[in-house]
């Protein structure tokens, strides 16, 4: 990889970006010249149908040493993704301790574990959710034909070398990789763990702000896209793809991360969650958690998300005469939560970094007994919730846990008991 410029970034969200690792590698005034500069091949990378509205269209022109078409047939791999098939649908509330870190050499692909999904990979909607754990860098290259990937590291820094450049991503940052983009995950620390949402629907975008105005939440300038960086390596390289949930591999005689220049908007990017401009009440009551939305994948129903990525970052709590934790709730949406660091303000214990929970459609949830008792009796001074970062993958379709998720020892069998300590405080003689 030509690393001289690899860790520079371009700022913005949804921009028409352009980058070249060699001067003059980008054609001027056209996309597909008869002879591309430096003897490169021209290739179009489409993330949406040609006839999408211009505001929705995602595509990038690449100028590369070898075209992607130069590969032998793919063969289904003997080792498939961990986690197995989906299990039985359950309305019960589920919570998991962190999955064990691998002890055998495990790269990012082998470390992916299926946790839940609500759609087949052949459908243009829905999501799949994975945990990952790894202790070695990938030596092969991977692409996912089934959807866009949202990576949420919880432990360990990652260097993600892609066709369009390099992203360094640490805990408290996220990365989004377009469907089909080739990449290699390298570990910058001895071990890595985190979460992945696979988006089978419309590409993620910033949510509309409505009456919030033209600024706030995740601001476009804080999203970073890499600059062009390429490998000119003539050596055996394994290329793995995920296609309809199955892993397939082929052997190349060159590195597929060989794009010297590119322009377009179908690009990878990263975002530092600490840059999120948190909105909250300065009077009373607890606003809806939609104010914490970082990115959204919409459905055809206006306002109904295929996937919302929501965070619960450090913030001040100043509401007067208010029960400040998230309220008790029954929800149309389905909520898969994770914790990157610290504690979640609705759960005093049991929900730890690297863990997860699933509350399905209309599953009652809310603060546990200890949190509730403290909040009812708290002295309502301004207080800061600090050193925390919880997040949620929220989706409008019911998530079905994998068989692994339902059978693994990390599933907390006593999760329901956290609400059993809620006291009966009703007294019809006292208002």
Swiss-Prot record:
Its EC number is 1.13.11.5. Keywords: Dioxygenase, Iron, Metal-binding, Oxidoreductase, Phenylalanine catabolism, Tyrosine catabolism. Homogentisate binds at residues 344, 365. Pfam families: HgmA_C, HgmA_N. GO terms for molecular function: homogentisate 1,2-dioxygenase activity; iron ion binding. Pathway: Amino-acid degradation; L-phenylalanine degradation; acetoacetate and fumarate from L-phenylalanine: step 4/6. It catalyses: homogentisate + O2 = 4-maleylacetoacetate + H(+). One of its GO terms (cellular component) is cytoplasm. The keyword RNA-binding does not apply. Its cofactor is Fe cation. Hexamer; dimer of trimers. Involved in the catabolism of homogentisate (2,5-dihydroxyphenylacetate or 2,5-OH-PhAc), a central intermediate in the degradation of phenylalanine and tyrosine. Catalyzes the oxidative ring cleavage of the aromatic ring of homogentisate to yield maleylacetoacetate. Belongs to the homogentisate dioxygenase family. This is Homogentisate 1,2-dioxygenase. It comes from Pseudomonas fluorescens (strain Pf0-1).
């Amino acid at each position: 990889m030509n690393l001289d410029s690899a860790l520079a970034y371009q700022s913005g969200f949804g921009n028409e970006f352009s980058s070249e690792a060699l001067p003059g590698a980008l054609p001027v005034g056209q996309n597909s010249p008869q002879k591309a500069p430096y003897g490169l091949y021209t290739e179009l990378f489409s993330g949406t149908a040609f006839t999408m509205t211009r505001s929705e269209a995602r595509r990038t022109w690449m100028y590369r040493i070898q075209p992607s078409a130069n590969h032998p047939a793919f063969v289904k791999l003997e080792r498939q993704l961990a986690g197995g098939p989906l299990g039985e649908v359950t309305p019960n509330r589920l919570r998991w301790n962190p999955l064990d870190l691998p002890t055998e050499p495990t790269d990012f692909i082998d470390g992916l574990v299926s946790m839940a999904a609500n759609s087949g990979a052949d459908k243009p909607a829905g999501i799949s959710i994975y945990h990952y754990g790894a202790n070695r860098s990938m030596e092969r290259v991977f692409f996912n034909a089934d959807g866009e990937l949202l990576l949420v590291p919880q432990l360990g820094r990652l260097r993600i070398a892609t066709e369009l450049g390099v992203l360094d991503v640490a805990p408290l940052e996220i990365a989004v990789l377009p469907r089909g983009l080739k990449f290699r995950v390298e570990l910058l620390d001895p071990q890595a763990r985190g979460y992945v949402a696979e988006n089978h629907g419309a590409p993620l975008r910033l949510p509309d702000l409505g009456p919030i105005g033209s600024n706030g939440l995740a601001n476009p300038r804080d999203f970073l896209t890499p600059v062009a960086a390429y490998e000119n390596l003539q050596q055996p390289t394994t290329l793995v793809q995920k296609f309809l949930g199955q892993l397939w591999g082929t052997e190349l005689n060159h590195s597929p991360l060989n794009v010297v220049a590119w322009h377009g908007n179908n690009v990878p990017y990263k975002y530092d969650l600490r840059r999120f401009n948190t909105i909250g009440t300065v009077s009373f009551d607890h606003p809806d958690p939609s104010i914490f939305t970082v990115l959204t994948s919409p459905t055809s129903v206006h306002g109904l998300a295929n996937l919302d990525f929501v965070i619960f970052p450090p913030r001040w709590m100043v509401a007067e005469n208010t029960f400040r934790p998230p309220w008790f709730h029954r929800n149309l949406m389905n909520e898969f939560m994770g914790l990157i660091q610290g504690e979640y303000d609705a759960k005093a214990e049991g929900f730890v970094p690297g863990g997860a929970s699933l509350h399905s459609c209309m599953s009652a949830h809310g603060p546990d007994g200890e949190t509730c008792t403290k909040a009812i009796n708290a002295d309502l001074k301004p207080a800061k919730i600090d050193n925390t970062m919880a997040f949620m993958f929220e989706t409008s379709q019911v998530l079905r846990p994998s068989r692994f998720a339902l059978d693994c020892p990390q599933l907390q069998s006593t999760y329901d008991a956290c609400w059993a300590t809620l006291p009966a405080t009703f007294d019809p003689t006292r208002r």
